[in-house]
Amino acid sequence: MKGFLIHADKCMGCHACQIGCKDEHCGNCWMPYAQEQPESGQFWLKVNQKEHGQCPQVKVSYIPTPCQHCENAPCIKAAENDAVYRREDGLVIIDPKKAKGQEQIVKACPYGKIFWNEELEIPQKCTGCAHLLDDEDAPISVPRCVDNCPVHVIEFGELDELDLEGAEVLHPESGTKPHVYYKGLPKKFIAGTVFTPADEEIVEGATVTVTNGTETYTDTTNSWGDFWIDGLADDEWTVTISAAGKEKVLTVSTVDEDKGLGDIALV
């Protein structure tokens, strides 16, 4: 079975994969795999960008997101007349002819990766560039998104040949068993800048400990007084900052969002 392994922590947001997908499918009809992708309104692969934290402690994550080519694909169950099928290699394909008029296929996807083409009245999505995989004379033998990435964020191949140790899937609660795996998905962080209000100077070398009772992380403020602890679970944390006999204790929640604490006075 084929699938994708996406290294989210390596993605720099250049959108080359997204552009490659557009270049491959806009203006090109790859029947029986897919009709043309509209130039606007559809991104069969999209780099989802999200800002984390609060100013000035902010970072941006980029997560390339194609069709998840699920083993238990809801779109297959929602389709009539076998309009959506799963190939022997694991790729999920929408038959453009059989799927005409079946808008319920779009609504079935829990990932929002199936799009409705108003003009053609068909659902459309990523095909895994099956037309390239099946064509021995094609210039490449992998999906365009894979070929286009300059830093090898996206891998494609047999699942048992990909290094999936520690990999995750999106929305595992859906029970769809996606064949798109991720490493380096963003976890929560707590960050801040420590200073002493008496002389309005930053504190270098302060020890910062973050614990939820079972996990403990430690950092030391740098020459700018900054600390940054990431890889945190969604939880309630006790943050202890200590330096030169002074200590400050904060209770911080990362349940809903990352926390950039801004300037923290150590008194």
Language-model segments: residues:
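Flanking helices and flexible, charged tails adjoining ferredoxin-like Fe-S electron-transfer domains
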Residues: 29-66, 76, 96-196, 267
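Ordered, amphipathic secondary-structure segments that act as subunit-interaction surfaces
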Residues: 69-79
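Short, ordered, surface-exposed loop/turn motifs in non-cytosolic proteins
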Residues: 188-190, 197-213
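Short Pro-Gly-centered beta-turn/loop motif in secreted/extracellular proteins
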Residues: 203, 226-238, 244
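Short, acidic Ser/Thr/Gly-rich low-complexity loop/linker segments typical of extracellular
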Residues: 212-226
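A short, solvent-exposed loop/turn motif at the edges and junctions
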Residues: 240-252
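Extracellular beta-sheet/turn segments enriched in Thr/Pro/Gly and aliphatic residues
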Residues: 253-267
